[in-house]
């Protein structure tokens, strides 16, 4: 078993997507991990991100939490993001001594000492590691989901509001995996309603 420092980094991904759950990861890194390539997941190409995620998982104690589209629609994306973070932390097999959280807000009812960091995924290694694991895990999930819904190109856009995704929504409507309360989707649905009047 490797030595660890008991500091956990937590980050979520998928807040800005129009489809799919929001994912979060909590990561406690090994002291021996090579941190050179661990940085904000958004700045790492897809294939390298998958390899880094695998490396981080092998050299850490980690857990992943999610919040569903239904929960996002019901409690809003901020609260759903915090819920996914809480779920990731609750699933950790080791209780950290402190949690470093990306962003301004922390999940409710955390019974662990924590600090929040704006742009923490760019500054704090354990948060960057959590960002990589969360994004790689969500990307793979969306690729698999995209096989069932190929018209929306989720294998390329991962649920984000790209031109091809928005065109897919306009042409084919929405699925149960779409966040119907999000403004771009709401606007498309409203324009379709007006067209039928």
What does each model-found stretch correspond to?
Residues 1-197:
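RNase H-like, Mg2+-dependent phosphodiesterase core
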